[in-house]
């Protein structure tokens, strides 16, 4: 049982550290938690506690992730930090830890490195909306010109991947000094500057209930004398009795009216995000609706078959494929509640994809699925997960 009640007085925001190995992501995570705990309450975290990240499973993929909480004057943050590069790739692609914003940690002594670039690219592909930069290890750089040069390089890199490089907050500091209790500009002051940037630069995310109505169809029943009932968990928004809704995906889009909302055998006048409900649909036949479609606010989402995605292919040890796959590989793509077959086109410079790789692919599905950029999917072969992905760009 939870020991204390979660106080929902402050808005909640999800963030995480990204960046090259050994640039100080975990040290910074510990420093933020420690400095903010002293200022606003909460639990300080030691480096070792964060570094020993527990294993979790997301979509059948094992990921090591550490979760840390902290508060500022205005907000409550949940922060994720991963020990290894592969964990970041998996985490970002599966959306196991959705980030409202990321803190890119870059060592001032080394400047941007290959994983700095790769994490920015991943953030772009998977739809992380905001990046703040913490230029770490500034205590090791005496030359102000060198610092300026590194800052310029980071801004250029962000702009290259369509983040607003020129307007991105860059905080200079030393996570190590801050963690050791240094009260100076590069220590505690830098952490407070970072907290301020988090509060001001990352907007408060829209709550699921404020989104436009969407519910993936899980099951369909026919109730004699009442009509067709569709069950599922409302992903976002609200549906009220009497509202017009659309059935999208797999078949041509049709409109219908919700004439009843039922939860735990009780009739309600509305259902909202997070509710497991049955919706009664007027004049809709049982065979008109199937698992894998979605119910939504009319016009809010369209069905598509052609898209680019960023995918992670499970390694053999993770229960994935034992062999590589090539161009025109045809697995099943599992979106929300159903599998749809599709063919994969690899980038020109990529002859094959090995188990354990991550890669950008182009996919053509044999049936349209209600999708938008940022939608997660699993790649399966005969019901077994062999990969995970996210829709980066819709092409049709």
Swiss-Prot record:
One of its GO terms (cellular component) is cytoplasm. Residues 174-176 are annotated as: G5. It is an enzyme of class 3 (hydrolase). Its EC number is 3.6.5.3. Mg(2+) binds at residue 26. It is found in: Cytoplasm. GO terms for molecular function: GTP binding; GTPase activity; guanosine tetraphosphate binding; translation elongation factor activity. The keyword Metal-binding applies. InterPro entries: EF-Tu_GTP-bd, EF-Tu_GTPase, EFTu-like_2, EFTU_2, G_TR_CS, P-loop_NTPase, Small_GTP-bd, T_Tr_GTP-bd_dom. The keyword Membrane does not apply. Residues 136-139 are annotated as: G4. SUPFAM superfamilies: EF-Tu/eEF-1alpha/eIF2-gamma C-terminal domain, P-loop containing nucleoside triphosphate hydrolases, Translation proteins. Its main location: cytoplasm. GTP binds at residues 19-26, 81-85, 136-139. CDD domains: EF_Tu, EFTU_II, EFTU_III. Residues 60-64 are annotated as: G2. Residues 81-84 are annotated as: G3. Residues 10-206 form the tr-type G domain. HAMAP family: EF_Tu_B. Monomer. Belongs to the TRAFAC class translation factor GTPase superfamily. Classic translation factor GTPase family. EF-Tu/EF-1A subfamily. This is Elongation factor Tu.
């Amino acid at each position: 049982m939870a020991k204390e009640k979660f106080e929902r007085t402050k808005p909640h925001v999800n963030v995480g550290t990204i960046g090259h190995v050994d640039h100080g992501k975990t040290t910074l995570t510990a420093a933020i938690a420690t400095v903010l705990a002293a200022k606003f309450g909460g639990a300080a975290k030691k480096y070792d506690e964060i570094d020993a990240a527990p294993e979790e499973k997301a979509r059948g993929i094992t990921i090591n992730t550490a979760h840390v909480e902290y508060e500022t004057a205005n907000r409550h943050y949940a922060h994720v930090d991963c020990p290894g590069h592969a964990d970041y790739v998996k985490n970002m692609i599966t959306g196991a830890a959705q980030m409202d914003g990321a803190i890119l940690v870059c060592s001032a002594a080394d400047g941007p490195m290959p994983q700095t670039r790769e994490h920015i690219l991943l953030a772009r592909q998977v739809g992380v909306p905001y990046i703040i930069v913490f230029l770490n290890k500034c205590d090791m750089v005496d030359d102000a010109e060198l610092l300026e040069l590194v800052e310029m390089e980071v801004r250029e890199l962000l702009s290259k991947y369509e983040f607003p490089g020129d307007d991105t907050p860059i905080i200079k500091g030393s996570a190590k000094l801050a963690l050791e209790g240094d009260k100076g500009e590069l220590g505690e002051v830098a952490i407070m500057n970072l907290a301020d940037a988090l509060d001001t630069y990352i907007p408060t995310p829209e709550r699921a209930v404020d989104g436009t109505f969407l519910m993936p169809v899980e099951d369909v029943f026919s109730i004699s004398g009442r009509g067709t009932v569709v069950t599922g968990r409302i992903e976002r928004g609200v549906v009220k009795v009497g509202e017009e809704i659309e059935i999208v995906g797999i078949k041509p889009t049709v409109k219908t009216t919700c004439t009843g909302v039922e939860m735990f055998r009780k009739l309600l006048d509305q259902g909202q995000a997070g509710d497991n409900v049955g919706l009664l649909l007027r004049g809709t036949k049982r065979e008109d609706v199937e698992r894998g479609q979605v119910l939504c606010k009319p016009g809010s989402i369209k069905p598509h078959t052609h898209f680019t995605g960023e995918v992670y292919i499970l390694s053999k040890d993770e229960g994935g494929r034992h062999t590589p796959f090539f161009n025109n590989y045809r697995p099943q793509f599992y979106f929300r509640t159903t599998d749809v077959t599709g063919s994969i086109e690899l980038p020109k410079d990529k002859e094959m994809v090995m188990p354990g790789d991550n890669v950008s692919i182009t996919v053509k599905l044999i049936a349209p699925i209600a999708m938008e950029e940022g939608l997660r999917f699993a790649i399966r072969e005969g019901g077994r997960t062999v990969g995970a992905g996210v829709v980066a760009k819709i092409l049709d």
